[in-house]
UniProtKB/Swiss-Prot annotation:
One of its GO terms (biological process) is translation. It is found in: Mitochondrion. This is Small ribosomal subunit protein uS14m. Gene3D superfamilies: 30s Ribosomal Protein S14, Chain N (4.10.830.10). One of its GO terms (cellular component) is ribosome. The keyword Ribonucleoprotein applies. Keywords: Mitochondrion, Ribonucleoprotein, Ribosomal protein. InterPro entries: Ribosomal_uS14, Ribosomal_uS14_sf. It comes from Bigelowiella natans (Pedinomonas minutissima). Belongs to the universal ribosomal protein uS14 family. The gene is RPS14.
Length: 53
């Protein structure tokens, strides 16, 4: 579908989807992760710069 989106840009809407879980709601665009995965990976120390407040 990415190839089709490049050929006809107005044909398919670009959805923000989590790359880990394919969840479409609560996705942070900068990280392409859902809020749940962002929290889990941050607590595990997999994301540099994330810390618990």
């Amino acid at each position: 579908s990415l190839r089709l989106a490049l050929i006809c840009p107005g044909l398919l809407p670009i959805r923000n989807i989590c790359v880990a879980t394919s969840r479409s709601r609560g996705v942070f665009r900068k990280y392409k992760l859902s809020r749940i995965m962002l929290r889990d990976m941050g607590l595990q120390g997999l994301l540099p710069g994330f810390k618990k407040r």
